[in-house]
UniProtKB/Swiss-Prot annotation:
It comes from the Bacteria. The gene is bamB. Part of the Bam complex, which is composed of the outer membrane protein BamA, and four lipoproteins BamB, BamC, BamD and BamE. Coiled coil: none annotated. This is Outer membrane protein assembly factor BamB. Transmembrane segments: none annotated. Disulfide bonds: none annotated. Keywords: Cell outer membrane, Membrane, Signal.
Length: 388
């Protein structure tokens, strides 16, 4: 199948402006002899993530204790029993427009975050909602600086919100009151999304769409350091995009960051000093486990890299341009979804494909693990639990 690179990105929920489209070939599904037989144990339908419009929201579920929290773009937020998929409660955040009119979609986006007794979700309409995890009642809602396409992050009593117009804001966890705002300088042309911040040692580490990684003090919102890991280049609009979309990962005093059309880089957590970099570009999140970085590059090549020096351990090219999700760890494999609705299991030692299973329609958000279960949310609104 041949599609434009622009079309492939639109399937991911990202929007580009480009005068010239680059054609890519999507590889056919590889034939895999399954080493084990993944099985669905339950399914649930929450509703499509397009909210009745032309845009798709990458809404990732989350799990806490024995509950899975899911949402769709229209505004439905639900708690499901993790073992059975049974609905425990539902909350409708769609916008009331009058007795004789249909509610407007809340345009929820990014994903659900569960911390303590509350869950949090943000929207493209620049709203952040806090709900009680036990029953779904609304604790508070606030307006922020812009549309929010990444999930809220909760740390040290604050909720971090990274808006698509380049603002990093900290809200009080108790009532949503604004504590501080930092401008990370958004560009006019960028991938429609936003790097999810990560936190460590009292700082927020976040990427931005100008190729920078920034460290910001959580208590006062002061930038401690910034490091550029990607330069603007190329002759087309897409070639000049250098967003740091992937969530930075902090391990053993190192910050691992990844830019589209840029580099995989290891930075010193406390100074931002560049320790090493590799020419690998991506906008999906990476996984760091036992000294190895597992990632999907922007051509959907799956790569394992030594975290100490950036040297490639192995790569898997059988899934090129299948619009892969970020990888997650499942025992001795990493698991990745694709736009054809398949889950793929890849051996962590050598990159061999060891199993695959058709789950649903397109899988564009990262799979979620709960014990021995994999939870996935498909673009058509189906939520599935799978075991190996």
């Amino acid at each position: 199948m041949v599609l434009s690179l622009l079309s492939v990105m639109l399937l991911s929920g990202y929007k580009f402006l480009s005068k010239k489209e680059e054609l890519v070939t999507i590889l056919p599904l590889p034939q895999v002899e399954n080493k084990f037989k993944p099985q669905k144990i339950w399914s649930y339908y929450i509703g499509s993530n397009n909210g009745g419009g032309d845009f798709y929201s990458n809404l990732q579920p989350t799990v806490q204790n024995t509950r899975v929290f899911v949402a769709n773009r229209y505004g439905l937020v639900k708690a499901l029993d993790a073992d059975s998929g049974k609905e425990l409660w539902a909350k409708d955040l769609s916008i009331y427009t009058g007795c004789f009119s249909r509610n407007r979609p809340a345009q929820l986006s990014g994903g659900v975050t569960a911390v303590g007794n509350r869950i949090y979700v943000a929207s493209e309409l620049a709203k952040v909602y806090a709900m009680e995890a036990k029953c779904g009642s609304l604790a508070w809602e606030v307006l922020v600086a812009g549309e929010t396409l990444s999930p809220p992050v909760v740390s040290d009593g604050v909720i971090l919100i990274h808006t698509s117009n380049g603002m990093l804001q900290a809200l009080n966890e108790a009532d949503g009151a604004l504590k501080w705002t930092v401008n990370l300088e958004a560009k006019m042309l960028n991938i429609r999304g936003g790097s999810t911040p990560t936190t460590a040692c009292g700082t927020a580490i976040v990427g931005s769409d100008n190729g920078l990684v920034s460290a910001v003090m959580l208590n006062i919102g002061q930038i401690i350091w910034q490091q550029r890991i990607s330069q603007t280049g190329g002759v087309t609009e897409i070639a000049r995009i250098n967003d740091v979309q992937a969530t930075p990962v902090v391990v053993n005093g190192y910050v691992y960051a990844l830019a589209y059309n840029g580099n995989l880089a290891a930075l010193d957590l406390f100074s931002g000093k560049l320790m090493w970099s590799r020419e690998i570009g991506s906008f999906t999140n990476m996984l760091v486990e036992n000294g190895i970085i597992y990632l999907v590059d922007q051509n959907d090549r799956v790569i394992a890299v030594d975290a100490k020096n950036g040297i490639t351990s192995w790569y898997q090219s059988a899934l090129l341009h299948r619009n892969l999700t970020s990888p997650v760890l499942n025992k001795d494999s990493i698991v990745i979804g694709d736009s054809g609705g398949y889950l793929h299991w890849i051996n962590i030692d050598d990159g061999r494909l060891v199993a695959q299973k058709k789950i649903a329609s397109a899988l564009l958000v990262t799979p979620l693990f709960d014990g021995d279960k994999i939870i996935v949310q498909a673009t058509n609104g189906e939520v599935h639990a799978i075991i190996r």
